[in-house]
Amino acid sequence: MSGFTFKQFHINQDSCAMKVGTDGILLGAWADVKHCKNILDMGSGTGLLTLMLAQRTEENCQIQAVELDPIAAKQAQENINNSVWKNRIQLTQADIQHFLQTTEQTFDLIVANPPYFEQGIACKNEERELARYTKQSHLNWLEWAATRLSENGKISFVLPYDAGKTLTKSTALFCIKQTNVITKIGKTPQRMLLTFAKQPEVLMQDQLVIYDADNQYTEAFIELTKDFYLKF
């Protein structure tokens, strides 16, 4: 599959190591974009999250995407250029830690679908290994993001369930929203959608089930993603 068409944009992905997946779509639809004027997408890959957030935000919202892999960055730029939001999106090909250390911009929302497979069996190509395997911990990513977060800003990640539990116990930031993602009703959670902030708030916890017992999409999943998927 070389491309993925959504209701308002198209993602070409033939040059990218990691393709469009449910995790990214969930995060792009779930993250709270209210009152956001500046958004950062850490590790933008194909540009999926960047374009989803552009679709959901007002014209005065600027989005900064950062991608380390030059091949993925080039394709993300093409996807951005083909969208109606290209004038308010800036893409930088850089190491995310270096970018955060050198930018003076602060952000109201920072999102990431970070690498989360531990290094083990080698991938067939270097780009896919870079996209899939993390040499830094998720706590590193969260701490780096916090350095450029506005005072009332939010950081939203999607992670494997166990990794999400570990992260919430490891950070000094406040977890203010947690959605446990269950692939099929009756199963245990597989993923966790998390939002962190500098200021304490009452933690909002819920769950999202993707498929019901008949292997049909649940109403909750359809409601969350209907502005993007052509099939809904």
Curated annotation (Swiss-Prot):
Top-level taxonomic group: Bacteria
Name of the top EC class for this enzyme: transferase
Entry GO CC: cytoplasm
Main location: cytoplasm
EC number of this enzyme: 2.1.1.223
UniProt keyword terms in alphabetical order: Cytoplasm, Methyltransferase, S-adenosyl-L-methionine, Transferase, tRNA processing
Localization: Cytoplasm
GO MF term set: nucleic acid binding; rRNA (adenine-N6,N6-)-dimethyltransferase activity; tRNA (adenine-N6)-methyltransferase activity
Keyword tRNA processing: yes
Pfam families: MTS
Catalytic activity annotation: adenosine(37) in tRNA1(Val) + S-adenosyl-L-methionine = N(6)-methyladenosine(37) in tRNA1(Val) + S-adenosyl-L-homocysteine + H(+)
HAMAP family, per the entry: tRNA_methyltr_YfiC
Family statement: Belongs to the methyltransferase superfamily. tRNA (adenine-N(6)-)-methyltransferase family.
Task of the protein: Specifically methylates the adenine in position 37 of tRNA(1)(Val) (anticodon cmo5UAC).
Annotated protein name in UniProt: tRNA1(Val) (adenine(37)-N6)-methyltransferase
Organism of this sequence: Haemophilus influenzae (strain 86-028NP)
